[in-house]
C-alpha cells in the first residue's frame, strides 16, 4: 500500500458493505477513547435491523460521504478494488481527503499520535487498545553503533 491508500477489511455479512460497493466511497473515522462507547455500540447493531444514522452527528462531504463530526481524524476514500477472503471483503481505497481536529495536530500541521491516541480493535481477543506512546524513532534500533 502506498501512503495515499488504506485497506478497510469488513466481514462479508456486514450490511454496510452493500452501500460501499454501490457508491465506491467510504469514510474512515478514527476512534479515540472519547468516541469508543458510541463506536462499540455501532458494532453491536446491524444496519439491516436498525437505522444507525442517529448514533453519531455527521456531515456529508461534496460526494455525499458521511463523516462523523466527533471523530478527531476522518479520511474520505474511493474504493479502487475489493479482495475477498474467507468471510471478509477487503476494500482497497485511495484517500481522497483527510480532515483532522486542530487539537490533534502539531504546529507543522501533522497528526500528533501522542495527543490523538487512536483506539485499535484487536480481532482475536476482541479487545480495544489505546495507542500513543513513542517507543523509538524509525531506523534507530538497527543502526550499528
Where are these regions (language model features)?
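Basic, polyanion-binding surface patches
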Residues: 1-145
Amino acid at each position: 500500500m502506498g501512503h495515499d491508500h488504506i485497506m478497510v477489511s469488513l466481514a462479508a455479512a456486514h450490511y454496510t458493505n452493500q452501500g460501499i460497493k454501490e457508491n465506491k466511497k467510504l469514510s474512515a473515522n478514527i476512534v479515540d477513547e472519547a468516541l469508543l462507547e458510541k463506536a462499540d455500540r455501532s458494532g453491536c447493531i446491524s444496519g439491516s435491523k436498525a437505522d444507525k444514522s442517529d448514533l453519531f452527528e455527521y456531515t456529508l462531504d461534496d460526494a455525499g460521504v458521511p463523516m462523523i463530526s466527533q471523530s478527531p481524524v476522518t479520511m474520505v476514500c474511493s474504493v479502487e478494488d475489493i479482495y475477498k477472503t474467507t468471510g471478509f471483503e477487503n476494500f482497497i481505497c485511495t484517500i481522497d481527503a483527510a480532515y483532522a481536529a486542530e487539537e490533534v495536530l502539531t504546529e507543522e500541521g501533522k497528526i500528533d499520535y501522542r495527543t490523538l491516541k487512536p483506539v485499535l480493535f484487536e480481532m482475536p481477543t476482541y479487545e480495544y487498545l489505546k495507542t500513543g506512546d513513542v517507543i523509538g524513532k524509525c531506523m534507530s534500533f538497527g543502526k550499528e553503533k
